[in-house]
Every structure is written in structure tokens, then in C-alpha cells.
Regions:
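Beta1-alpha1 glycine-rich phosphate/pyrophosphate-binding loop at the start
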Residues: 2-81, 159, 170-176
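FAD-binding core/adjacent interface of flavoenzyme oxidoreductases
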Residues: 1-10, 80-160
Length: 176
């Protein structure tokens, strides 16, 4: 992107979500600006968690600011517009992103990186007893509530980590 008034905006690239991929895109365009390309980041979270540090954060090795990335300086470095909003709709006929409380945002190119959400609807009891790690921001809120509940209780507490990948093992070790 180039904010010079001599170079008009020719194309709009809109990034929805501040996940890993879009952080890399912002960094790339900050270091390799494209004249006439306007970048826009739409994100519901201005501080996005870095998932690789999640087990260390849960274990108490990192503070919030160490395990999260503030997207505002990164967007500024890339000369990107940043909107703190949640996308409610995409209008492909008019090439607009719709967010509550703001005018439509035009795009020529769009990239969506909003993270995953595990499907727990069809697992009996999951809504009452499971804490999916994704989306991470919701997990962290639930985790803090769980830690408070355990700390205030005199009863034994049993925790099961479901998932045998490297992330599951790291989370199991971090919760000890």
C-alpha cells in the first residue's frame, strides 16, 4: 500500500480476521508495498492471541501482553486501515463487506482468516462440560473462570484433555 497522494487507490485488499495468516500478510506488504493497493484489516480483537504461546500462558510462564499481538502497530507498519468490528455479511454483487454500525467496505480482493471452531453440537454433554481451545479468546475467558472455580473449591477436580496431537499434549502438561 502506498499512502502517497500521488498514487491513487486502484485495488482494495480486505483482510477479515487478525489470525496468523493475516499477520504475515500485513508484515509482507509492510516490507513490500504495492503502489495503488489499499489494505484494510477488519478484526473483532485488536489483541490477538499467539496460539504457539498458549500452553506457556496457561502454565503461567507468560503474561497477557507476551502471548498476544497488538494488531494496531502492525497495521500501521503496513499502512493498512484497521477496523475494530465484526463482519455480519458479505455482499458479493457489490463487492462490499458489511459490519454493524459502519458503512460498507469495498473490496476487490478478500481474504478470510477468522479461525476455527470445533463442532461440539452433536457431542452429548459438550455444551455443558467442554471448553474448546478454539476460538482462543473465548477459551481464555472460560479458563480464567475455571481456575477461579478450582481455587475457591475444597473438592478434588478432574480435568481431561481431549486431543492427542502435539497441541493436546502441550495443553495437558500446561494444566498441571
Amino acid at each position: 500500500m502506498n499512502n502517497s497522494s500521488a498514487i491513487p487507490v486502484i485495488k482494495d485488499l480486505v483482510l477479515i480476521g487478525g489470525g496468523h495468516s493475516h499477520r504475515s500478510v500485513l508484515k509482507y506488504f509492510a516490507m513490500n508495498p504495492v503502489p495503488g493497493l489499499r489494505l484494510t484489516l477488519i478484526t473483532r480483537d485488536l489483541h490477538t492471541p499467539y496460539s504457539g504461546m498458549l500452553p506457556g500462558y496457561i502454565a503461567g510462564h507468560y503474561q497477557y501482553d507476551e502471548a498476544h499481538i497488538d494488531l494496531r502497530p502492525l497495521a500501521q507498519f503496513a499502512q493498512a486501515r484497521i477496523y475494530h468490528a465484526e463482519v455480519s455479511d458479505l455482499d458479493f454483487e457489490k463487492s462490499n463487506v458489511i459490519c454493524a454500525g459502519r458503512p460498507p467496505i469495498h473490496f476487490d480482493f478478500i481474504s478470510i482468516n477468522i479461525g476455527s471452531k470445533p463442532g461440539t453440537l452433536h457431542i452429548p454433554g459438550a455444551d455443558n462440560f467442554a471448553m474448546p481451545v478454539k476460538p482462543i479468546d473465548r477459551f481464555l475467558t472460560q479458563w480464567d473462570q475455571l481456575v477461579d472455580k478450582i481455587t475457591d473449591s475444597k473438592n478434588a477436580f478432574h480435568l481431561a484433555v481431549v486431543g492427542g496431537g502435539a497441541g493436546g499434549v502441550e495443553m495437558a502438561l500446561a494444566t498441571q
